[in-house]
Amino acid sequence: MSKQQRRKGNAKNASSASAHGYLAQGGENFVGLTPEMNIFEMASSNRLSNFSGIDDETRIVMRKLTKKDCQTREKGLRELTNIIAETSSIENCYEHFCGLVPQLSTDGSPTVRLLTMKTITLFLVKLEKSACKGLKKIIPMVLFARCDVTNGVAAAAGAVIRDGFEADKKQKVIQLFAPLVFEMAAKIVQGKHDLSVPVEYDASEDREARKSRLETQSLNVFLSYIKEFGADSTIWEEEARKLFENIAFLKMVFGGTNAALKVQVLNLAYRFKNNVEVILNTPSIVTYIQNHLDSQTFTPECSTAWEGMIILLPSAQFHTKVSLQNGIYPRFLNVIRKKGNHWRVLQHFLLPAVVLLLKEMGSLENNMKVLGTIMESFTDNLPWPTDASINAVLSWFNAFSDFVRWILTNDRINLVVWEKLHPLIVTVTEQAMTFPTKEIAECVTDLLQWIIELKTINEADVSTLLLNIESKIVGAGTENSRLIKHLLTEPGKNIVLSNLHANLLSSPELVDFQIIKNLSCSENDYFNATSQKISNFSFIEKTENFDITQAGDIVRLIKLLLENQEIKSLNISVKNDHVGRRLLLTGGSTIWNKLLKNVPVSTFQNMINYWHEKRNGTAIADAVSFLKEMGVEMDTKQAAENVEFLITLLRKMKSTDVSNEAEKNVLILKLFTAIFESDEDAKSEHYNCLSEHLTSDFNSGQFFEKLFASSEEYDIERILETACRVDKLIDLCEEQTRQNIVNNVLLSGKQCGTIIEQFQFLELEVMSCSTKPTVISTTHQHCYSHLDEHKAKEIVTESARIALFNISSKCECFFLISHEQFFFSDYNSAHQVFGWQVISIISALEKRYSLVALTEELQRSRREIEERLIRSDEVRFKLDDSSPCIFLADAYDMSFEQKKKYIQCQAEPSKVPEHALEVLYRENQTPLDFLMNVFEGGYQMFDFDRSKNYHWMINLMFVKKCIQYGGSIFVAEESGLRDYALCGIVTVLDIHKRSTLQQSTDILGNTPNAFDEDPRLEALTTLFIELYLVLNDSIKNDNHPTQTIEEWKEFYVPTINSLFIRMFRMIRKEQQPTPFVRTLLKAMFTLVEFPTNVPNDSVVTREFVPELSVFKYSLLEESFIAQAFILLSSNVEHVQLIGYAAAKLLVPIMFKTENPQVLDDDQDETEIMVANRSKLNLPVMISKSYPVDHIHKHVGPLLLSLAILPLETTKEFVLNQEQRVAYCDAIDSFFKNALNALMLDQPFDFSQVPIVCKIRKQMYFFQFRYSSHFFTAKSQEREYYLQSDLTASPLFFEKFASRLLFKSITLLPAAVRLFHKNIPNNFKPIFQEVVTKHASKLLIENELNKVQNAEFGEVLKVRTVPVTGQIISEYTVEDTKMKLTIELPRDYPLSVPAMNLDKAIVKGDRAKKWLLQLNAYLFHQNGAILEGIEMWKRNVDKGIEGAEDCTICMMTVHQQTNQLPKVKCKQCKNRFHSNCLVSSFHTYKWFESSNQSTCPLCRNNFT
């Protein structure tokens, strides 16, 4: 193949099919080879030389069956099965396949043999009668394969006969072809058949393996046929007898090492009718049998040998060849004396063989002697080897037991042999105690029990035997004799063993619990016989030795012993142990009088305390009741909450006297409490018992309200489970008392109202924040008592638990099936109303404390309550009350009539004309319709009489409708409406006492408690601030006319912003986050700068700050600064943020006031001189306010945000480079502490892990949750790090911390780098990971964008490479470019950028100075990349400023060296390039061309 042909894409895979195609194309031109030839087919060439009548595809498949590789043969068989299934004419294929069956069915691959059988089955099934002509070839091989050593092949061969022939012909087929199979099998075994030699192409196994496999399979042919058809069938004998006539074959078998083959030959010999003759005619078989009677292998050689011995022993022919007395009998003795694995076989064959031996040996006397010797041989060579098989040992014991039983049941020999058996039994028993297996011990003890029950041996001999065994037990020790002792003393044993049992109990070194238990469980006769013989009762007197599982049996035995009048020496001391406690529970007069009567009461009390710890109330009740009957009173206070204890006491109360009713009621209430306070659900019998004792006057004492009044987080599932428990209990109560019990257990309507009353302070949230304009309560004119966050959440959580519990109970509703509707009782409707109110209260609470997420319990409580609420007529009726609850009106959708009635109720309809009131509830009016009706109706608006509810109502609804209408006010057709609404904002927010109307309040004067005096004023103010914010957002985001925007910004914004600043002064440090506080916070965040139009009247500094007095602050400024930083230390986060927002506006004033001289100086920005650097100061209130403790966790980060404000380039702050460096130095120490607080002191889940972990967790959460949605991890990074989100939400401080961290690494990269270097090592990798993964890439992107968007002039061209983070600056002078490369690392700013300067056009030391200066600015002085490039450009500009052209080359920068003219003439002061004067590589060679070393201009000599 040429090189072109070998190119990629031209190569093809080698395959048999490809080779066949090439050979077919070439015919016989390739040295006589054709597609039909194969070098591996030589062994089958005669059979396969001509495939006539089959197509090419089938021919190829048939050829595969003769391939050398077994995988190819397997593939060919599978393809052949497909052809058989898909092709209709397969006779020719079948004919050719039959010739291959002998080789394939004996193939070395089991898979090939298996597939061959399956293929034969397919042929037979499909061809049916047409397959008859090939049966003679294939059926013998199938029958042969039925005995294959591989089970799968044998099963497949059996399936051929089963599926290929009808049921009545199967046996005939086998009988017909069996002689052929036997003939083939015999030849294969003798090595005379062609199949016994592997064909040349079969490489699956070697010659020996194939020979062994086929020999085994051939002998199995005979044995399996005999097993299937019985030994009576003799058609197999002719061929089998040839095997035993072949002396060479037998010598080969028994002289070889194939044990399985020997066993098969022996088994075949045993199946002949004249088997003894066949065996004796083969001397090697007789020798083999005698030699393998004690074979230790795990093959069946030993059992086969004994089977042959059993056949030979009765034969007289065998006796003539082998002496029983001198040959077989000694051999038997040797086999018995030997202790090995052969005993597993001897157990089954020894006794029959010995019986036959004794029968053939003759006289009784001789037999007794032989039998005695055989029995003595059992105990020879003891003990057994330690490595002996336990199965073999057990077989030895079983064999000995069988011999003993046979001997003792034989009247002729039992008494004669007993004298020898007695010591042997003792020895065997002693040997059994050396093996810790129950089977061996059972074998021996069963034999002893059988001997005792047989009664053949007299009692004296039996007693002697037992005494000898007892002595062996004593000698063996406690552990070795354990099993024997337990089994000999088991219940149900013969009374003869009672003496042994008593002796064991009386011996402390031999007794154990099982022996004691056996006595306690024995029958009366055995127990009495044994107990009377016990001489020492110490085994039971030490009761502390028994555990709780043994105590029951011990107490039963003690009770039996106490009832036995003949036992006097029992001395038991009752203690607080398991036995003592069980004795107390057992009770009874006998135990009390003999054991418990004199026990100290303290012992009984300790028992009760123990049961209390184990929560065993039943035991406590039983014990207390028994002791009470005996006149002993016990303290049971600890068990008062135990359900079992209480139930048991109730059941034991037999008397129903009035004197016991009080005690009974107390127990019932305790049981009620215990069931519902338990972590686990009570049992059914507990509920049944409680329901039996509950009456209609049962009083739970507000149990569930107290149960749920817990400050800890409560599992919602527990509440629902408690409701289910109540349902279970109520269902079991009687119908006449059920409803009364429900009323006493669940919350009443009056109680619900009492709970709601404590949430009046949250009504302000509904009035101010509800999206339903009609939900306005103006009836509450008293001062609200605002709770702090902790207390408010606590009582709301408790109320939510109670509401969920009450509405979760199914017993609150009754069904009217005929109408398919719910009907509620008064209690149920009260619970539903209470549920509606609670979800409104939870929402109001969520709005109030918006910076902190609701607890998981409250969130889930709200969901669970909402799922169970039902909108029903009964609940709607509650809205028709004269004073409906504002929470219910907020949560429930009111109808038009209800809205009308609600408004009429609030607006004092008796004093308001109906036509004037109609505007408030008119149906189907849009917000614009309402505003126009009010605008044209002449109502008192904005500055109104505060004593009239109606005026409050119209103003509150007006502002809510304005908020709904939003920015559309600016484009309203009626321009008067726009001015009316906008002026109303200013009017309401700037209400003074100068108003002539009655009861007007000045909220901006010196009355900071104005809102507390009238909450309606706070709601109104809040709504108008909200309206301003809505309109302000509309101006920013919507398209409005230019005139409208200018009017808004020039008139309304300055005026209202000034009002906001004045409102800020009335915020108190301890003030709760009411709607006004939260809305003012939003308004403060919208302010860009401190208003200049704030009036300076009546300003009183709330706190004197000495640090501020040294600066030239105005009284107004000092007052606001002090107020802002006072609020920063508040415990209320919203108030903290208001202080922060105000301080943020005041920082520019503070910075300029406290650094006046430095900021006024006009510094040179070319170089930053450390020695002469001006000093700037951090505003003193920022450093002074830094907390010394961790109480105010957010103050540190908030102050850090204020401290770095001067570094941000804004209208208020424009610092040059030197001033930036000076300010960075000033805040260095503060920055370290504040950044540490930012990282470590945030109130998140990780108390001792940096906040960055929270940031990282948040990023991973979003990345996982929104990976396939709109929100991606990247967008979340930008949201957290780049966007300044000041929305008051639970994520506020997380986002604030993330943004502040990003600003810190942007403005103070060097300081952050130093901080990272010094933080503890366990935090360092986490900080590194977060900054690298999230912040660095955004920071690098920002830096590159800044540089990319900057303008540097014509001489400096800057480009960025975002992929590598490179910034390449090229400074061009004439045709020469000097290049500065800055590469930002991936973890910038934690690692420093790499810088490189190429083609410097100034001296090397000056270029290095520029780089060092840039390095110092970026690495140590918190310089930005853009500013560093600008500084480097200024240095280069200054370096080449005033540089003149070289008059030789007329260029400023040398084209080759990129240097400025440096060589100076002392006379004319002109400068030249050194290369222009002397270089030999340049066109200009002045010294050489002029042949002198003079100046080209003044001719002065340079030398």
UniProtKB/Swiss-Prot annotation:
HEAT repeats: 52-89, 93-129, 133-170, 280-318, 323-345, 346-384, 552-589, 640-663, 664-700, 845-882, 1022-1065, 1078-1117, 1141-1183, 1302-1340
UniProt key word Calcium: no
GO biological process: protein ubiquitination; rescue of stalled ribosome; ribosome-associated ubiquitin-dependent protein catabolic process
A Pfam family hit: UBC_like
Any one GO MF annotation of this record: zinc ion binding
Record-linked SMART domains: RING
Subunit structure: Component of the ribosome quality control complex (RQC), composed of at least the E3 ubiquitin ligase ltn1 and nemf. The complex probably also contains tcf25 as well as vcp/p97 and its ubiquitin-binding cofactors. RQC forms a stable complex with 60S ribosomal subunits.
Name of this protein: E3 ubiquitin-protein ligase listerin
Lineage: Eukaryota, Metazoa, Ecdysozoa, Nematoda, Chromadorea
